[in-house]
Every structure is written in C-alpha cells, then in structure tokens.
Amino acid sequence: MGHRQYKIVFTFIVEFGDLENKSLLLAKSLRRFYKDANEYPIYAVRPRRGKEIKNSTKEQFKALDVIYLYSPVNRNWEFFDFANQVYGPALIEELIDGKAEFMVYLDADVVCLHLPTELSLPDNCLVGITPVDIGRELGNDAAIVAEDSLNITWELAYSLAGVRSIPKWNVNTKVEKLQIYPYFNSGFSIVRPEAQIFRLCRDMFEMVITKNYFRYFNYSGKLVKTQNDTKKSSLFFIDQIFLTAAILSKCSREQIQIFGNEYNFPFHFLKEIQSEPYNLEYIIFLHYHNKFYDLKWQSNVRLDSETREWLANNVPIKLEKHVSYKIRKYMRYGRTFIKWHFNAIKNKTESD
C-alpha cells in the first residue's frame, strides 16, 4: 500500500456543552498512549452549525496536540445528533485518504483505559468494529434475529449501499449473546480510509433526503421490542444500520475484523455482562455513556493502580449546565421531537 504519512488518525465529535468535557477526557486518554502527534494525529470535528465551543476547550485541545476542525457538512440532518457520527468521520476519512494507514473513530463518551495492543488490521482487512450491545427485547428494534426476514428499513439500507443479499454469517450481541444478522455498534471503528466506508454511509444519508425515503423508518417515538413486529426500525438506530450496510457493501467477511468487548465495552451494561467484582483491567476502550458524572461506579470495580490513579485525576467530568435547545426538547418530549423535525424535513422535500 506504499508509505503513509501517519500510522493512525483518531477522530471524534465535539460540540458546545457536554461533549466538550467528554471529548477532552477522550483526547487526554489517547495521548497517554499515543504521545507523538506527528505519527498519531487527533481530530476533534464539529460537523454542524451551532454555538462555538469554549476558548478554554480550544486551548486544552491545542495543549494536547488535537486538531479542532469546524466544517458544517451536516446540514440536511443537523436536527439529528447521531448523523454527526457519520458526517464527521466521513470528512476526516476523505481528508486523510492516501496519507494515513488507518482511521479510528470513537464516540466522545469513550475513554481509553489501556494501551490497545491490536489497534491495526491484517493486510486483507478494511475495517474493524464490534457488534451492537443489545437485541430487540432490550430495546434495539433494528437487531434482526438470524434466519428471520429483514424489515423494510434494512432492505432500504441494503439497496442504498448496493448489498445484494443477506450475509450467510452472523454476529452476537454483547449483552445477551443473541445471534443476529450483521449489525455493528458505531461507537468504535477502525477503517482503511481508501475503502471509503464512511463516505458511502454519508451518501446514503443524503439519498434519504433527496429521494424522500422517510416511509422506511419508524419515528413515532415507539421502539418495537417484539419479534412479531419487524416492519420498520427506529430512526434512532439509522447511523448504525447504514454504517453496517456500507461495511457489507465494501467488505467480504474476511475483510472485516470483529473485535471483542474490550474494544468498545458498554459500561451501562456492566452488571448484565459480568458478575461482581467487576473487572475493567482488560478493557481497552470503555464506552461509559453517563457513568462518569459521579464516582458511584468505582467502589466494586477492579482496576490496576495506574489506571485508577489516572481516572481519579480526571473523573468525574463536569456536567455542563448548558444543554442545547435540541437536546432540551428531546429530553422533555422524547422521540416525538425527532418526529417533529423529521416531518419538517419531509414536508420540505415534498414541496420542492
């Protein structure tokens, strides 16, 4: 593949408010192990319009050799937070194509606890990723049990990505170990930029808008939890559905490395996965969600002394008082607010 300027480029999303503190924690944790910014650049991307991040955040990014990039590429889906997780990495993927061997995307609420020993891919692989956390019974209505039929949301995703048939292999959810059709968690991934996986996923998002494919999604605010009703999947999971379809379009099974739980461990399901005392000594990337706003979690968790000391100096993170208008509305009215935004976009496209 020839000489590349960078071995690995890391990237994550940052926006004004809560994501600032989370992304700073992630950046600090990465720089513990990847100190050379010339070999391991880190990009903090703000891919949609909104209030600028604080100057203090920018200064801390600079001290950590983190490149802050504001580029409002997410315009058609700027009402939907999770679309940032596609538009942001797609932007960096394109920017570093031909310059970096690998790009690692991480959700902002992830922290690197230990040095990744396998953060690369075999020569024949184009992507590394982990399966989704849970199945339908626990709330992920896009998880289709193996040998069941696809719903129309997945059929649309396959069609937009150019996937011709259902793969003949399966994955297991992290929590229940439920066997499902390939369906990946978008919180951690490592890709070869030249594979253009995130760019395909971004293009799929754009096609939903331009082709008016809204009827393929459930955005009523109700998650479907029973196997008897698999007609549509929630808009809530569209980023993971589309990313999975993009991966299946670009890669054969042999070109996909499926990492273990230690590379994207769902901390909020700790009790369901492990028994006490809970062991985090082997965890590489911990997906902590909202668990680091206090220290309640640490009393019965086993950790090596070095990692425990580092966390003691950096956690809990501050819960920002400011919450964006969109998030406040979402917290107050739930997914009905997404439905309202979705209908607004739908009506706009129908009138054009």
Where are these regions (language model features)?
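Glycosyltransferase catalytic domains, chiefly GT-A lineage
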Residues: M1-D352
